[in-house]
């Protein structure tokens, strides 16, 4: 079944790819203008899980943006795994630079 990217809310999910690959997807849902972004920062393999670190960015108040409804998303392709895929939203720029001791 097809995935509906035009959702009005944020979501995270995994899609099957070709052969031995999968796609990790993070979406922001429907936004009223351009300038909203999604960035998958790191995909970290841990002993029992794959952790996906991502962040959202909103346009600055004075930023010139596209005046159109947008559906920001990001995706990465990784090798298929039986490990659980976990998602961690990074709220602050330096949060992921302190090392990869991620608390989930």
Identify the residue ranges that each predicted region occupies:
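Exposed, flexible binding/inhibitory loops of compact, secreted disulfide-stabilized domains
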Residues: 1-104
């Amino acid at each position: 079944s097809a995935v509906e990217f035009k959702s009005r809310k944020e979501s995270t999910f995994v899609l099957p790819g070709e052969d031995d690959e999968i796609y990790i997807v993070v979406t922001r849902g429907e936004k009223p203008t351009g300038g909203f972004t999604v960035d998958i920062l790191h995909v970290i393999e841990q002993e029992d899980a794959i952790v996906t670190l991502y962040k959202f960015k909103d346009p600055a108040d004075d930023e010139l943006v596209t005046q159109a409804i947008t559906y920001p998303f990001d995706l990465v392709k990784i090798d298929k795994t039986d490990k659980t895929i976990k998602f961690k939203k990074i709220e602050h720029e330096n949060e992921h630079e302190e090392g990869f001791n991620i608390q989930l």
